[in-house]
Regions:
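N-terminal leader/auxiliary helical segments
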Residues: 1-86, 93-323
Length: 323
């Protein structure tokens, strides 16, 4: 993660920066939530009781064959909804790989979000802060964080995901499970708004007995952001020192998202060769922002089609300079 609204906001700002007119906003936002959509699928069931363990697959997608999955999405795009889902997904990848190391840093011992559940508390506080900045209201409605794609758009997105998941991870996931994942993601998110704190208090009690601190309350908005966030920090994964805190990193994420979107559009239009889009996107772990043996692993599923089979046919992706 970050949380949903942060991802959707980052993707929208990136699209605006390159004058791309979003025509399927729910599909675009669904892509901006990336693999996180899978984490709510039948979460109330034990993994072995689920129709498919999508939460485990979502975790795998953050760490394994990340670049191969992005290339598979790019290769199988055919429709407008699929174009915009993929553009949103590229933004999710950009934001996660830039912001996650900072999230890990502020959750280290001595950091403002050290302790049980700190990761979630920071991310929902950032979500609440950005939503308040944009709308004047810090409570984040589900339809702002994860609007639900419907009808033909949803069918086209699930088809794209089926192809990419099969090709990259060898995972055969039904269209019904994928469609339900988007539905559950939106519905579960609706449980985590608590304007007057009643649900937060209830979830706090539940956490005492199930799941541990932050399992539920780490997703509840509104939440105030700590005032002592560092601008200078050390990446726990690499030991590298950085200057620039959460809001500077958000601006970087918008720029990187815009770069990835531009690259994808140019690739589909035949301007950017396959080797260049592979180099541009890389294959980084979503959590550390670095390339690892696992993140750079090749696709585990059936062989991909030749490069000349790639690219959307209709409608073509377009930009609108009037936006």
């Amino acid at each position: 993660m970050p949380e949903g609204y942060t991802h959707v906001r980052t993707a929208r700002k990136a699209a605006h920066a390159i004058h791309y007119k979003v025509r399927c906003p729910e599909a675009f936002a669904a892509g901006a939530n990336g693999p996180d959509v899978f984490f709510s699928f039948e979460i109330w069931k034990r993994p072995r009781s689920r129709r498919f363990d999508l939460p485990a697959l979502g975790s795998r997608m953050h760490e394994e064959a990340t670049g191969a999955f992005l290339q598979s999405l790019l290769r199988h795009v055919k429709t407008g909804a699929q174009v915009e889902y993929t553009l949103g997904f590229l933004s999710h990848y950009a934001a996660d790989t830039l912001l996650h190391p900072y999230v890990a840093a502020v959750c280290e011992p001595g950091g403002p979000y050290a302790g049980k559940g700190g990761h979630g508390y920071f991310e929902i506080a950032l979500d609440s802060t950005l939503h308040a900045e944009d709308t004047g209201v810090s409570q984040v409605p589900a339809d702002d964080a994860c609007p639900l794609p419907k009808g033909e758009d949803l069918a086209e997105i699930t088809l794209l995901l089926q192809q990419a998941l099969r090709e990259t991870y060898g995972a055969e996931v039904s269209a019904e499970c994928l469609a339900d994942a988007f539905y559950y993601f939106n519905r579960v998110r609706r449980l985590f708004t608590s304007r007057h704190g009643l649900r937060r208090g209830l979830f706090y009690v539940v956490e005492t007995f199930f799941g541990g601190r932050g399992f539920l309350t780490g997703h509840v908005s509104p939440r105030a952001l700590a005032l002592n966030l560092p601008d200078d920090w050390t990446d726990p994964a690499t030991g590298q020192q950085h200057h620039g805190g959460a809001f500077a990193l958000l601006k970087q994420a918008e720029r990187l998202s815009a770069l990835y979107m531009t690259g994808a559009l140019q690739h589909w239009m035949g301007v950017l060769p396959q080797t260049d889009i592979v180099k541009l996107l890389g294959s980084r772990d979503y959590g550390t922002g670095t390339e690892t043996e696992r993140s750079t692993a090749p696709a585990a599923g059936p062989a991909a089609p030749p490069p000349d089979a790639a690219g959307p046919t209709e409608p073509q992706p377009s930009t609108d300079k009037g936006e």
